[in-house]
C-alpha cells in the first residue's frame, strides 16, 4: 500500500471534548470522526484495526467450533416481550415503530433472536451442542456517551451463543469459549486478566470478564499475585479480617461527638483507629399486594467497618434482599431510629429492623457506632452484651488492597481494567422463557442449556490505546496495528536510488504477506515520522541517499529509544526476523 493511494488525515491537536487518551489519539490519528453523540465514522486507518481484530476473533471462534451467522440489527419487539426484557430494559433500549405501527428494537444484544433460531432449528439431541456467533453493530442509548468509542452508543461486538443438552455439556462449551478467549487476547498482544464476575442483568450462574489492564480503566480488578485468584470488585470475596472475636475490655459509653457525622471524623475526634468504627447503612424492601401497591415495608440496617465500603451486588445476594432493595427514605430512617442519618446505630431503636453485619463487623469487640442521637456516638460496644447478635452475617463489603486472598494463598492486590470481553453460563433462563426445547433420546422435550460470550470489537481499540501509548502517539501491538511496517523514504520524489530501494523493499515485504505502507507523499522527514509515530505503526524503515551511499538504511521499532543501522541488502530479512521474534 502506498500512502498516496490511502487516506491519511492526522491532527496536531485533539478536539477539546476528547477526555481520555484513546479518544484524543484516535481523533488525532484520523481513525475516527464524530458524527453525533456517541456515534462515530470509522475512517480507513481505524477500520483496518477493526478488521484485524475481527480476523483474529473469527479464526479462534472457528477453531473452537463456533459457526458464524448474522442476525439483524432491527428486531421485532415480540421476541423481547417473550422474555420480558422489552419492558424491563430502560431507555438504553431504543424502541422504534414501523409504518404499520409495529414495535421493533435496535438490538443491544441478540439472546432473543438466537434463541428463536435455536427453537426452530435445533430439534433433536443429535444436533447438539451448537454454538452460533456473529459480529454485528449494536446500539445502546447511553444517557451520557463519553470517552469516544469507550462508551459510545453505536458499537460493534462479537456475540456467541452456545446450546447444549445438559449442564455438563454446557460447562464444556463454556470452558471451550473461555480457552478461545484466552487465545484471542493473547494474540492481540495486550496485558489482560480473566476475572470471575457477577452475571448482572443478563442473568445466569457463571461469569468471567476479560479485562485489559489500564490505569484509566473504570473497573477495579482484584487478584492475588501469588495464586490464580482473580475477580472483579463486585464479586471478590472479602473474608473476615478478625479470625476470632475478642473479649470485651471496655464498658459501653455514650460519647459526645458534636458535628462529627462520619466515621473518619469520629475516629479523629476520639483519636482512635478508623477500623474501630462501624458505619450504618439503611435499606428498605417493599412487598406489593395484588394491586401493585406497597403492602409492607421492611427496614434493614447493614453494618460495615468504618474504613470499608458496602458492595451493592453482594448485598443483593443476601436472603431477603435478593428480590431488590432501595435506600430507605429519611422519614423511614427517623421513624425506626429516632434520628437523622449521620448518628445511626443498632442500639436504642424505635422500631425493629433487620440487622446484617459484615463478616468483619460480626467479629469486632469494643467498637464504635452511632447512638441514634444527634451529636452522640456509643463506644465500647460488644455483641451479646450490649446488643443481640445480628440477624445475619454476610460478605457485604468491597475488598481492599492487602486483604487476605480467599484461597488462602496470599494477600489481594487491586489494579484498574477495561472490560472488553464477557462470558456467561446462562442455564435455561432464555430457553424456558421462549420454550426452546429439543427432543432427547426418549423423545421427551428438554430445555436447552445456554451460554453467551461477548467481545467488544470496537472497544478493543480504545482499550489497547489506553494501555499502550506514549507522548508521541499510539503503540499498537503488531497483530492489530493498521500497518505492521512503514517505509519512510527521504527524497522519494527527488532521488531515483531512494525510490528504487523503497519500492523494492515495499514489494518484497508485501510479497511475503507483511502489511506494509510506503509513504510516498513527499512530506518532510519530521512531519512524516511524527505522523507514523502518532498512528502507531510498530516498525519503521528510513531510506535516504546518505544511507544508501554507505550501504545502510535505518530501522526503528516504535518502542525503541533510538534507530539502528542495517545493511541495505539485508533489511528485508532483518524486518522479517523482527516480526518473527
Curated annotation (Swiss-Prot):
Sorted UniProt keywords: Aminoacyl-tRNA synthetase, ATP-binding, Cytoplasm, Ligase, Nucleotide-binding, Protein biosynthesis
Cysteine pairings via disulfide bonds: none
Major subcellular location class: cytoplasm
Gene3D superfamilies: Anticodon-binding domain (3.40.50.800), Bira Bifunctional Protein, Domain 2 (3.30.930.10), YbaK/aminoacyl-tRNA synthetase-associated domain (3.90.960.10)
Reaction(s) catalysed by this chain's protein: tRNA(Pro) + L-proline + ATP = L-prolyl-tRNA(Pro) + AMP + diphosphate
GO cellular component labels: cytosol
One of the GO BP terms on file: prolyl-tRNA aminoacylation
EC numbers for this chain: 6.1.1.15
Molecular function per GO: aminoacyl-tRNA deacylase activity; ATP binding; proline-tRNA ligase activity
Localization per Swiss-Prot or TrEMBL: Cytoplasm
Superkingdom of the source species: Bacteria
Assigned protein family: Belongs to the class-II aminoacyl-tRNA synthetase family. ProS type 1 subfamily.
Domains (record comment): Consists of three domains: the N-terminal catalytic domain, the editing domain and the C-terminal anticodon-binding domain.
Subunit structure: Homodimer.
UniProt function note: Catalyzes the attachment of proline to tRNA(Pro) in a two-step reaction: proline is first activated by ATP to form Pro-AMP and then transferred to the acceptor end of tRNA(Pro). As ProRS can inadvertently accommodate and process non-cognate amino acids such as alanine and cysteine, to avoid such errors it has two additional distinct editing activities against alanine. One activity is designated as 'pretransfer' editing and involves the tRNA(Pro)-independent hydrolysis of activated Ala-AMP.
Protein name, as recorded: Proline--tRNA ligase
Upper classification of the organism: Bacteria, Pseudomonadati, Pseudomonadota, Betaproteobacteria, Burkholderiales
Recorded name of the encoding gene: proS
